[in-house]
């Protein structure tokens, strides 16, 4: 194939134009999806129309250019009119050109703005009379710029009504800004309808004024309907965006990952929302310290995040950011405000504690404990007095016996090593410990790598020797010795030793406790010497060890105490012994009896026992037989022909080792049914009384005689003390129921005659009624009755009372003589009779019935009875304590 060569200049120019055209068309890409917006007929300036998805068309567009200058498109695809646009047609279209300079790609997005008019439905035509409806005057959209510079009054628009064609119309307005607050900001010319504003307006104070226009004739007729006339204030970017806080304070963990949210800043703008005046962009203006840059802020949301993982609190613990916010979507002509943001880096446990040395050495004396022996310092760069800084020490090796304990000093954060159990120089002269340290909070690198890391150090503890005195080990030692060993024999004693020399040289021994004082101890050797006979059977309990407490003392006076347990081996030093001494056998009911024996020795020297009759006399062997029952008992039987009496039966018992003893049993062969019925006289016949028993018997007999003598004397004294019979009246009442003075109570001077035949006689001779005494008798005559009382016999102390009514009574010893009785009663009876005779005419007798019918003034005597006061006599108190023999008479008189 032959390629023609274009050599002419015309051909070359044509080829150049063709290549240029192809190059231009290479930048023109295919059109993206068409976007349609339904909008009103009038579009306000800077009011969003809609949003176009730019990334769906070209994801990496760095150039955005609308084909129509009346519109602008932001980075997020928002479409705004740059001025007020009125759609004359139903549609208006333009394109958004997107370009990517790196990829050398260009695409277009068709945008269509549609305005749909309302279509009225067709109505069926009817044959009606056509009327012309009154057309309403329509307002023209009106607005004014915020903070307008005038000149004022500023013309806004002209309002005209169709009624002006037929009438002379006058215009007026009302509403806020005209005749309402704020007043007179707007007015309208009455004749022309021109609307004016008188002053600048702040949109943030008043964003719209809703006025109402009126058209009326001169006579006040409303030529047209009132017209709403809104006046919108167009926003001006006159307000700076402001942060909500002057200083923000945030915290972020140390070593945070990329993209960790630190906090959010926020700003507000008072300008009209959803306009460029309030589209804010955030940015970081300055960071202190300046490098490296660790933070970024989202331009639209204000969210601050980390952009680096290198954030170390130990290097920088606090950052200061100067935040900037700018309206007009961050364009260079937007208004700017700033704020301060303080970011504090929170501490994380990213620094492990470390020992300052790898090895440590210390020393401690043996046998000391609860003492501090070493302080181990550590370094930690984390924040002081936090869980990331506080150290936690652990003994990893060398403390298997629990000798040591390590704690943390909360002030210095040092490890404090202490000895809690005493160390023994002889056993461990040196101890090596491995100490580990970490923090209370987990190490973040351990968590991330899941590999525990712990700093470690070695500690060598040297144990110092100390004279700790002798040691009694074991605390109990045992020794065996035979019972009844010879006094003065020696046995091994308690052995203590010096832990340093491992022997007992230089130690002295001392006995502290020996319950029976059986042994003595040698001071130097510690050997025990038997000082008394050892008797195992007196120990309680017998099979227990005999414990001796011993003290070992070294040359410096230090001591220890141990126990020597002596096991006393039993020997057959005790013969078996029969328990019974006296036995009762009831014949013929009981044909035998059992006897038993005991041996205090060990069982090896004890049963089985052998029982035998020790007496070889034919009489004993003929009557008694002895048969073995078991190891410790035998049965003693008798012949039926044996007589009932007490027998002395000798029985020999022998243990298994041949040790034997003989005992004579007193066997009472008795004719009874039960042993308790057998008399004990035979049993006690052989009993002899001691001197103390005889003395006790004599004292008992003397005491018995003294008691009997006291009783006899008491009976005699009681009989002598009885004076009168208990009842001289023989329980007979004297009849004295007359209205006149009784003959048994009233004494008369004429009727009371006393004749004394013998005044020298002893005793008390009493009368009841009248009586007489002749030849040693005493006669007493009274008004009524006759009684004779024999003379009181002094020698026999026996008195006889013969009653006039036939009564008879004997009395015992008299208390008074007759002269004493006569001298006592005679003056008083005479005085009584004399007083009665003197007052007989003046004082009525109290034994007669008297009438008291005078109701006048009171009686001078003060009583309706007899003169009781005059009847009272001195010296008659003895009548208040009568003897029992007079009580019956006194009670009878009192009842009356």
Curated annotation (Swiss-Prot):
Swiss-Prot/TrEMBL domain comment: Calcium may be bound by the cadherin-like repeats.
PANTHER family assigned: DESMOCOLLIN-3, DESMOGLEIN FAMILY MEMBER
UniProt protein name: Desmocollin-3
Subunit note: May form homodimers. Interacts with DSG1; there is evidence to suggest that the interaction promotes cell-cell adhesion of keratinocytes.
Propeptide position ranges: 32-135
GO cellular component, one term: plasma membrane
Domain Cadherin: 136-243, 244-355, 356-472, 473-580, 581-691
Major location category of this protein: membrane
Gene Ontology biological process: homophilic cell adhesion via plasma membrane adhesion molecules; in utero embryonic development
Upper classification of the organism: Eukaryota, Metazoa, Chordata, Craniata, Vertebrata
Mode of membrane association: Single-pass type I membrane protein
Tissue specificity remark: Expressed in the basal layers of epidermal stratified epithelia from birth (at protein level).
Signal peptide: 1-31
InterPro entries in UniProt: Cadherin-domain_protein (IPR050971), Cadherin-like_dom (IPR002126), Cadherin-like_sf (IPR015919), Cadherin_CS (IPR020894), Cadherin_pro_dom (IPR014868), Cadherin_Y-type_LIR (IPR000233), Catenin-bd_sf (IPR027397), Desmosomal_cadherin (IPR009122)
Record note on disruption phenotype: Knockout is embryonically lethal. Embryos die before compaction is completed at 2.5 dpc. Oocytes and sperm are fully capable of zygote formation. In stratified epithelia conditional knockout mice, 10% of mice develop severe external epidermal blistering which is exacerbated by mild mechanical stress within hours of birth. Affected mice die within a few hours of birth. Intra-epidermal blisters show acantholysis just above the basal cell layer, later stages of acantholysis show lateral separation of basal keratinocytes and at the bottom and roof of the blister half-desmosomes are present.
Positions bearing carbohydrate: 166, 392, 547, 630
TM ranges: 696-716
Molecular function GO labels: calcium ion binding
Residues in compartment: Cytoplasmic: 717-896
Gene3D superfamilies per record: Cadherins (2.60.40.60), TCF3-CBD (Catenin binding domain) (4.10.900.10)
Subcellular location: Cell membrane; Cell junction, Desmosome; Cytoplasm
């Amino acid at each position: 194939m032959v390629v023609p060569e274009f050599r002419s200049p015309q051909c070359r120019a044509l080829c150049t134009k063709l290549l240029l055209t192809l190059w231009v068309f290479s930048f023109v890409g295919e059109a993206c999806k068409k976007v349609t917006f339904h909008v009103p007929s009038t579009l306000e300036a800077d009011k969003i129309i809609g949003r176009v998805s730019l990334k769906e068309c070209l994801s990496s567009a760095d150039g955005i250019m609308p084909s129509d200058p009346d519109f602008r498109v932001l980075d997020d695809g928002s479409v705004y009119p740059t001025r007020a646009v009125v759609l004359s047609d139903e549609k208006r279209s333009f394109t958004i050109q997107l370009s990517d300079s790196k990829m050398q790609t260009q695409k277009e997005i068709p945008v269509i703005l549609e305005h749909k008019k309302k279509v009225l439905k067709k109505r069926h035509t009817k044959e009606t009379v056509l009327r012309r409806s009154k057309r309403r005057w329509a307002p023209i959209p009106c607005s004014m710029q915020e903070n307008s510079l005038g000149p004022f009054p500023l013309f806004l628009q002209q309002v005209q009504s169709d009624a002006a064609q037929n009438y002379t119309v006058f215009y007026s307005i009302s509403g806020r800004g005209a005749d309402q607050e704020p007043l007179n900001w707007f007015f309208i010319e009455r004749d022309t309808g021109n609307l004016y504003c008188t002053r600048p307006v702040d949109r943030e104070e008043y964003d719209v004024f809703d006025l109402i226009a009126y058209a009326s004739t001169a006579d006040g007729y409303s030529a047209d309907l009132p017209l709403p006339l809104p006046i919108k204030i167009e926003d001006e970017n006159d307000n700076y965006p402001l942060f909500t806080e002057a200083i923000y304070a945030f915290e972020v963990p140390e070593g945070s990952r990329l993209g960790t949210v630190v906090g959010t800043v926020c700003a507000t703008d008072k300008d009209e929302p959803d306009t460029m005046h309030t589209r804010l962009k955030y940015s970081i203006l300055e960071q202190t310290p300046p490098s490296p840059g660790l933070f970024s802020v989202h331009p639209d949301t204000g969210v601050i995040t980390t952009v680096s993982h290198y954030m170390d609190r130990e290097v920088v613990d606090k950052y200061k950011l100067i935040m900037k916010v700018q309206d007009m979507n961050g364009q260079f002509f937007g208004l700017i405000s700033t704020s301060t943001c303080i970011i504090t880096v929170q501490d994380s446990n990213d620094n492990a504690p470390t020992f300052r040395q790898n090895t440590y050495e210390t020393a401690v004396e043996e046998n000391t404990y609860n003492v501090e022996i070493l302080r181990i310092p550590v370094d930690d760069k984390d924040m002081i007095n936090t869980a990331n800084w506080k150290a936690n020490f652990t003994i990893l090796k060398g403390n298997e016996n629990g000798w040591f304990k390590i704690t943390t000093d909360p002030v210095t954060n040092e490890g404090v090593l202490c000895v809690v159990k005493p160390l023994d120089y002889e056993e461990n002269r040196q101890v090596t410990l491995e100490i580990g340290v970490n923090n209370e909070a987990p190490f973040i690198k351990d968590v991330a790598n899941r590999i525990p890391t712990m700093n470690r150090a070695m500690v060598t503890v040297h144990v110092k020797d100390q004279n700790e005195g002798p040691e009694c080990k074991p605390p109990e030692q045992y020794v065996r010795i035979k019972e009844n060993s010879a006094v003065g024999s020696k046995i091994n004693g308690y052995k203590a030793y010096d832990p340093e020399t491992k022997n007992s040289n230089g130690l002295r021994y001392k006995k502290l406790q020996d319950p029976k004082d059986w042994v003595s101890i040698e001071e130097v050797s510690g050997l025990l010497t038997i000082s008394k006979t050892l008797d195992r059977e007196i120990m309680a309990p017998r099979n227990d060890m005999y414990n001796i407490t011993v003290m070992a003392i070294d040359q410096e006076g230090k001591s220890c105490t141990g126990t020597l347990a002596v096991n006393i081996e039993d020997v057959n030093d005790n013969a078996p012994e029969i328990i019974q001494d006296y036995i009762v056998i009831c014949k013929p009911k009981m044909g035998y009896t059992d006897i038993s024996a005991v041996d205090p020795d060990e069982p090896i020297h004890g049963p089985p026992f052998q029982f035998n009759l020790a007496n070889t006399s034919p009489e004993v062997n003929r009557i008694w037989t002895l048969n073995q029952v078991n190891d410790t008992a035998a049965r003693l039987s008798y012949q039926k022909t044996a007589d009932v009496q007490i027998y002395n039966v000798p029985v020999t018992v022998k243990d298994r080792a041949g040790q034997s003893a003989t005992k004579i049993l007193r066997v009472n062969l008795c004719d009874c049914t039960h042993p308790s019925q057998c008399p004990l006289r035979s049993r006690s016949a052989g009993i002899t009384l001691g001197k103390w028993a005889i003395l006790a018997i004599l004292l008992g007999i003397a005491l018995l005689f003294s008691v009997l003598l006291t009783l006899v004397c008491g009976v005699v004294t009681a009989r002598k003390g009885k004076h009168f019979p208990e009842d001289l009246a023989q329980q007979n009442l004297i009849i004295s129921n007359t209205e006149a003075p009784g003959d048994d109570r009233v004494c008369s001077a004429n009727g009371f005659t006393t004749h004394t035949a013998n005044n020298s006689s002893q005793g008390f001779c009493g009368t009841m009624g009248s009586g007489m005494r002749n030849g040693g008798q005493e006669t007493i005559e009274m008004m009524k009755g006759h009684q004779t009382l024999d003379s009181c016999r002094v020698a026999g102390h026996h008195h006889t009372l013969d009653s006039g009514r036939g009564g008879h009574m004997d009395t015992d010893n008299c208390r008074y003589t007759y002269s004493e009785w006569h001298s006592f009663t005679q003056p008083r009876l005479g005085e009584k009779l004399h007083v009665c005779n003197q007052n007989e005419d003046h004082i009525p007798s109290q034994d007669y019935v008297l009438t008291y019918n005078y109701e006048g003034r009171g009686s001078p005597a003060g009583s309706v009875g007899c003169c009781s006061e005059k009847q009272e006599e001195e010296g008659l108190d003895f009548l208040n304590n009568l003897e029992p023999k007079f009580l019956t008479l006194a009670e009878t008189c009192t009842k009356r």
